[in-house]
Structures are given as structure tokens and as C-alpha cells.
Regions:
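Glycine/proline-enriched, intrinsically flexible loops and inter-domain linkers
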Residues: 1-229, 233
């Protein structure tokens, strides 16, 4: 969400936008704990970043089974709770350190109810000068710019992977559903979007979720438009 707040900058009051975002990566962290937790915080940053806001603070809340239990007590087809807890913490920390984001509050809950599926929740708070955020309607002839890291084959199926049924075959296939994070690239975009001269050129901005180009670009168009025609250009 985004709200207007007064902020005092160099002794002068300015109109700023304050943004909040939270995201859960329960399924990705359950199957690939390092990447799942890393992209949990990465995804949290990505949403307010598309709103042209800079993320200043984060929070992490997780839930898992008792990490002290013996390996033999691990449920069939599951990673040990200790492996999940330690590797997820390393993944979250790695992404946060690379992008330079402080996590001021962490709460790790241990309960048998989280053995079936882990809880991995991240939350952030971001802000931007209201004058630097333009929200206008797209028009014919507008240019759609794809900005960020190169697209790979990782993460395919991630949008539906958390909801579909799994069997033992999934153990050898579902890890590829977890997107590979790219904190240094996201950090570059963060720094770019702190320049108001850049962000004021943007009519509408959207982040890439699991739906990819078709969803991200489609959401940029107004709901009453029947189609969006794209002519690809590589630079």
C-alpha cells in the first residue's frame, strides 16, 4: 500500500509516499531454502521499487519445526528442519547483505504445525518523494522498457507450483521452480530510481512476478484495452 506522509528534509517539510509490502515464500523455501528465502526479501523489495520507492527497512518472520530433532525423524520427501532453518537464514542474509538492506526485526517460530510446510515471510517499508512518482495512463506509441537482469529458465512454474499436487517425482523437478535471485542487479535499479529525473519519465511501472512478460506488460495497459501490441527491439 502507499500513503502520503509529511517528511522533513533539510529543515523543510515535503510530501512523501510511504509504502509497505509483505510477501510469503513458503513453498519455494520448503523445496530450495536458500533461494526461496533470498527471493522472498528480493520480491518484497521489488514491489515498492516498481512504485519508484527506496526500501529502508525489513522484517523477517518464519515458522518451522523443531530444528533439534534427529535426522531420522524427518518426514519422507522433506528436508530436515535444521537444514531448512539454517539454509533459509543464510539465503535471506545473503540477499540482504548484497543489496544493503537492514533487517531490524526477526522472529523465528517453532511449532509442529509448520512441519508440513514452512512459513517464510518478509516485509519492508519504503519511501519516495511524491513529486518523483508519476502515475499516468498509457497511450498508443508509448515505449515499454524491460529493465533488469537477463531472463533464464529458472522459476518456470513457480506461480502454480505452490498450489498443485506433488508426489515423489517432484523431488527431482520442483527445485527449478525457484527463481534465482540477482541482488546486485536489483541494487543498480534501486540507485537509478533514486534519481527523480529518471522516475518522472515513467508513466507506469510494474515488477516481474511469476507470470513473466505476458502478465507484467499486460498489467501496464488499462483494463478497457483489448490488446497491447509489442514490437521487440534489442539495445
Amino acid at each position: 500500500c502507499s500513503i502520503h506522509v509529511p517528511a522533513v528534509v533539510n529543515g523543510k517539510e515535503q510530501d512523501w509516499l510511504l509504502m509497505f509490502k509483505n510477501e510469503t515464500h513458503n513453498h519455494p523455501t520448503e523445496i530450495e531454502p536458500f533461494g526461496g528465502a533470498a527471493t522472498c526479501i528480493g520480491g518484497c523489495i521489488r514491489d515498492p521499487l516498481s512504485g519508484r520507492a527506496y526500501v529502508h527497512q525489513a522484517m523477517r518472520v518464519t515458522g518451522g519445526g523443531d530444528p533439534r530433532k534427529e535426522l531420522a525423524e524427518t518426514l519422507s520427501g522433506k528436508l530436515p528442519q535444521r537444514k531448512l532453518a539454517q539454509t533459509a537464514a543464510a539465503g535471506y542474509s545473503s540477499y540482504g547483505n548484497q543489496i544493503g538492506l537492514a533487517t531490524g526485526h526477526i522472529a523465528e517460530l517453532y511449532h509442529e504445525g509448520y512441519v508440513a510446510k514452512r512459513l517464510e515471510c518478509g516485509a519492508v517499508v519504503a519511501a519516495a518523494p511524491a513529486d518523483n512518482v508519476v502515475r499516468e495512463r498509457p497511450a498508443p506509441g508509448d515505449v515499454v522498457i524491460l529493465l533488469g537482469g537477463r531472463t533464464g529458465r529458472d522459476g518456470i512454474g513457480g506461480a502454480t507450483g505452490s498450489s498443485k499436487s506433488h508426489d515423489m517425482k517432484s523431488l527431482s523437478t520442483m527445485a527449478s521452480e525457484v527463481q534465482k535471485g540477482n541482488a546486485p542487479e536489483e541494487r543498480k535499479i534501486q540507485r537509478l530510481f533514486r534519481d527523480g529525473a529518471v522516475t518522472r519519465l515513467i508513466k507506469r511501472c510494474n515488477d516481474f512476478g511469476a507470470g513473466g512478460v505476458s502478465v507484467a506488460v499486460g498489467e501496464l495497459a488499462d483494463g478497457d484495452r483489448k490488446s497491447t501490441r509489442l514490437n521487440s527491439s534489442h539495445h
